Amino acid sequence: MRSDAVKKGIERAPHRALFKAMGYTDEELERPLIGVVNSRNEIVPGHIHLDKIAEAVKAGIRMAGGTPVEFGAIGVCDGIAMGHTGMKYSLATRELIADSCEAMALAHSFDGMVFIPNCDKIVPGMLMAAARINVPAIVVSGGPMLSLRHNDKNLDLNSVFEAVGAYKAGKMTEKEVWEYEEKACPGCGSCSGMFTANSMNCLTEVLGMGLPGNGTVPAVYAERIRLAKKAGMKIVELVEKDIKPSDILTPKAFENALAVDMALGCSTNSVLHLPAIANEVGMEINLDIINEISSKVPNLCKLAPAGHHHVQDLYAAGGIPAVMKELSKKNLLHLDLITVTGKTVRENIENAKVRDYEVIRSIDNPYSPTGGIAVLRGNLAPDGAVVKRSAVAPEMLVHKGPARVFDSEDAAIEAIYNGKINKGDVVIIRYEGPKGGPGMREMLSPTSAIAGMGLDKDVALITDGRFSGATRGASIGHVSPEAMAGGPIAIVRDGDIISIDIPNGKLDVEIPDSEIQKRLKEWKAPAPKITKGYLGRYAKLVSSANKGAILENK
């Protein structure tokens, strides 16, 4: 066993003495040592209950003959960090989580790992760690929050963000906003739509790193506890068979994940995270691959924010296995890949079926013949930009309008709330990329303000930052190269006409190439906003969004 390095032989008597100081017995030290990474904390609703998940995982490990060793991981709540300096830290914590899990796992020679995440950056951070460490591993997430019905509307966190915009526009009273605040998040779990957390939890299942049900079983259901116990039992089997992440996270597994991503209409953040996870196993996923898969995989689901269904509805309709079963009917998935069940994808979905075709469309009756995410290119985004096509109003799929340029999210929010944005405008928020932010903040506050004020069918927003999975509307992010790196978005001026053509994958500023080159020569990078601490180091090392915003060894 790998753990023999810390527990076998006379030379390891001091090591065993330290284990015994914590109450471990000789019998426990004879068994496989399984690291259990628990990201439970009291600031993230999706993580407040993870102690119960961890206890179930540890029970499963013991039942199967292993010895669990629990340790903690950090986790930021993107919702609470939203709209202020705190959001600069969110994406950056993905790397901190991966690095800290790597350090703990390799420092203590665990035989296997169980990762317990739930929310936005914790899931990909732990998947990156699993891939990098490459000992047998399984992910068991905390599960989605329920959506509560209020006044004939299914609420979620995004409902509250949009309510603030509606209040600013005089369309809701303060009391009505308060009622949303009281009802929108009824308990523990990852926010209830197909936002980033649930997107990544579902894709974990598709990649083969989580058990069937990992993405959709609600947080408060007893089935989630049973799933955690099964994950604990399964990791011991994976250790015995030495099935590692490198056996599971193959190029075909990532193609499956991208296909289901398109079918579900996942968060655009998945386009940041899947390349970063792939990078850990030496693979490259670029925007061209994403576009190719999007062009042939139909969109089968319109979950919030694209529609009114939530993840609990997807669960009731058959979950991720049912979606995969539909895609398999047109040979859009690789079915002979090994997963953490010890079985193949084909075996995992063999008995799956759609129970509600209102939630999961038939492969022959999709919402659209192409996927939920589109990659755009043009002179405004030579290296690409990303939009959640499934959440864009039909009238905004093709749009031209004058640029309204802001050099920070804060300035844009102020202008939107003060009624300074007009129908037809294209709001550009720049210097919010991985380097420029630094940290590539999510723009949920401005997009929700636009939607809440009733402008989501008239106003587009373009940024080198990124968007929450809860964002809807013509919200185009990840513009690469970013402004801080001298990308063309840095030289756009107020009044320049911006041309958006999502069906044809185009994003341009309508000025001559000679003028673009002239402005680029005159441009000078502004001083970095943050130079100290972790974000200062992060800004120096982070790559462009089109590469997954990974840290590069320079």
From Swiss-Prot:
It holds the Pfam family ILVD_EDD_N. It comes from the Bacteria. GO terms for biological process: isoleucine biosynthetic process; L-valine biosynthetic process. Its EC number is 4.2.1.9. One of its GO terms (molecular function) is magnesium ion binding. [2Fe-2S] cluster binds at C119, C191. It catalyses: (2R)-2,3-dihydroxy-3-methylbutanoate = 3-methyl-2-oxobutanoate + H2O; (2R,3R)-2,3-dihydroxy-3-methylpentanoate = (S)-3-methyl-2-oxopentanoate + H2O. Pathway: Amino-acid biosynthesis; L-isoleucine biosynthesis; L-isoleucine from 2-oxobutanoate: step 3/4; Amino-acid biosynthesis; L-valine biosynthesis; L-valine from pyruvate: step 3/4. This is Dihydroxy-acid dehydratase. The lineage of its organism: Bacteria, Bacillati, Bacillota, Clostridia, Eubacteriales. The gene is ilvD.
